[in-house]
Structure formats: C-alpha cells, structure tokens
Amino acid sequence: MRVPLLMENGSYEIKFGPANLETPYRARNCLTRDRYGRYHLSNQMDQIRDISHCHIRRPSELGQLISWELEEQIWDYCLFNPDEFGWELKDSKDVDLIASETCMTIPEISKNMDQVVFEEYEFGSMMKCPVAQFVPFDRARDYDIVGGAGEVVEAKSGYNNFQLVVDSGFNCTWVMPVIKGVPYYKATKKLDIGGRFLNGLLKETISFRHYNVMDETILINNIKEQCCFMPPVSYFDSFQRKEETRVEYILPDFQTSLIGYVRQPKQAIPKTSQILRLEDELFTVPETFFHPEISNILKPGLVETILECVSMVPEVLRPLLVSNIVAVGGNFNIANFATRLATELQRQCPTDWKVRVHQPKLDAALQGWKSMRQFSQTDSYKNSRVTRSEYLEHGADWCTKHRFGYEQWI
C-alpha cells in the first residue's frame, strides 16, 4: 500500500508530511507584510528582523477557508520546498491525500478544496474530514488521563467507541461527540474563543495598562505562548497569589533580541531594554474560556458548551462521553487547561458521572496529525477515500453530498 500524505490544514499552522514520519513538518498558514512593505510567506516570517507593525493575512476567515488563491501558494511552499523541509512532493498522481477541514464547512466552500486537490494538484485519492473524526483512531499511549479531582492516571491504548472531542484551535473551539467513529453533528457545538481571540484580548489588556501593542501581533502571540497559564484552582485563588506568578518580559530592542524573552530570576537587565511586568494578565486572558463575561461576551463558557452538547445525545451515552473527553488543539498547550476543565466540569455533572479528560503528553497541536497517521493504517480509510477517477466521473457535488459533507449525518 502506498504511503499517504497527511495534511492537517489548521488555520494557524499546517502540519504535513508522509504517514511514515514520526513528527510532521510545520508551516504557518499565513502571509505576512512587514513595516517596509515586504511580503513573507509562511515560515519566512522568521526572517523578519523588525517584527513591529507587521500585518498578517490568513486564508481562513470566521472559521471558513475562503481564499484558495493564498492557500494554494502556502501549499506549494509546503509541498515543493526541499531546501527548508528536506522533502518535496514528487508525482502527486501516485500520492493519496488525507486532509482535514473545519467542522461544518459550508458545502460550496468545501467543493473548492475538492477541485484544487483533484484538478490542480491531481492527487490520486483524497479523504478529508474534521480533526475530531480522526481522534478515536489514535491507539498510541500519548495521553495522560486527568480525573475530575485533578488526579492523573495512565492511559490505555485501543479504539474507543465513544469520545467527546474538544478541539481548541486558533479560530474557535469545537465540541464534537464521535460515536463509533461517526461524528454526531446534531450535538456539535462551537465556542467562539480560540487563539486569535486570546491574542486580541491580550493586546487590549497590555495596551490599556502598559504600552500600546495593538500592532504587535507577533510579539503578543509569543508572550501568550511563553507566559500565559490557566488558573489551576480558580481565578480568585490565582488573583490572590499574582505576585508569586509575576513575569517580567524583556521587550525586543532589535539588536540583542528580535522577539523578546522572559527574564529569569537574578538575570541582569540590559540597560537599554524595556520591561513588561505582567501579573493577573497572564491568567485573566485564558480564564475567558470558562468565564467569557470577563471580556464582555455574554455567551456560555466551555463547561456550559460541553454540557449543552452532552444534553443533545441519547441519555445512555452521556456518562460515557463525559468520561472520555479528548483535548486536542494548540490552546491545550496552555498550562493547567485540561486539569482545570476536568475539575470545573465535574462540579457541574451528576455525582455518579466520572469526568476524565485525555490530555496529550507532548504537543497538543500535533495530536490531530498523529491521529490521522493512525487512521491511515485502518480499513476505514481504504473504504472512505475518494479516488480521482471517481471525482472525474461523478463531480464535486457528488463528493460533498455522499462522502465529505456533514449534511448526510444530520
């Protein structure tokens, strides 16, 4: 059997590579214009020496992939760039593609991907679906199980028939029940808080309290990834101890540092450097997952969204789903996120339900790609893919209606 090509087409970052790789290649899914008007595609962003006032454009807007003109250039950068990745796509006609797309993709937009894959790149076959649909096929022991009291137990390998996948990415957070490998779209819920929202809120908070950083997208994203954490117990508990968790971030001076860094204890401060002292900002911003009212968003938080999702599945499955929650997506790299989710959800559930959250041991952003890798070795993949000859015979409408569209499950 041929080794398929896996592409986890995230809105922030594309994870891609042949299925025989242990870890994927990674490329940012964006086009960046620096303050001098020069354009940098994908990972070329790392070559920018002055990160101030950079403008970033992404192919995805409001969770939908709407700009294939830009996305195709980024795919070319990924697939035909041996100088950076040490690998390139040779003959796409002999390559099978497994790709991801966002949940509830509008059918007309979903057809665009079919046309690009089969008509522009001419792949031999394709299988695409949301990342959550691949997760139950992950048989590797890459998870820690966090219980409702915060305890951690060893994960067991094997296919799980009932899982509640919480995919928290850059655009938003999806909560999707997957029952025997089939997504239960009737109960799928969306929380409009993701990495992009956290960046925006952190910008506003720092600009109001310290310096104007509304045009410093790259800097703020770096501060979020290095410094922010979820309150392990509660917001009020962390607020009382904010002095203990205070962080001093040395802002870039574009001579000794291009993106800034966290000052370590007893580390000398350069005389010409500016210091950003962060206290409650570090945990107030991630806390919006559980309490959106902090940012004046009058919508349910993550726990309420999960409970609403669970209430829409058959009653006999509800405790099974709650005890098999899988946390994937880059936002679960935020410290204490999965543990806090388990404890908060346990308080809201009936006493005879046991909440368990499966947390990736390493990088949660890569867990979707690793699940796709496991899926590529199953008979389910062989039976569900669409070949190029089938596409040319039936057309894009047939692919969306009978194979890839979510409407057939509703």
UniProtKB/Swiss-Prot annotation:
Q: Where in the cell is it found?
A: Cytoplasm; Cytoplasm, Cytoskeleton; Nucleus
- Superkingdom as given in the UniProt entry: Eukaryota
GO CC annotation terms, alphabetical: cytoplasm; cytoskeleton; nuclear periphery; Swr1 complex
Q: Name a biological process GO annotation.
A: chromatin remodeling
Q: What GO molecular function terms would the record report?
A: nucleosome binding
Q: Which UniProt keywords apply?
A: Activator, Chromatin regulator, Cytoplasm, Cytoskeleton, Nucleus, Transcription, Transcription regulation
- Keyword Metal-binding in the entry? The reply is no
Q: How does it assemble?
A: Component of the SWR1 chromatin remodeling complex.
Q: Write out the similarity annotation.
A: Belongs to the actin family. ARP6 subfamily.
**Record's function text:** Component of the SWR1 complex which mediates the ATP-dependent exchange of histone H2A for the H2A variant HZT1 leading to transcriptional regulation of selected genes by chromatin remodeling. Involved in chromosome stability.
Name of protein: Actin-like protein ARP6
Q: Which organism is it from?
A: Eremothecium gossypii (strain ATCC 10895 / CBS 109.51 / FGSC 9923 / NRRL Y-1056)
Name of the coding gene: ARP6
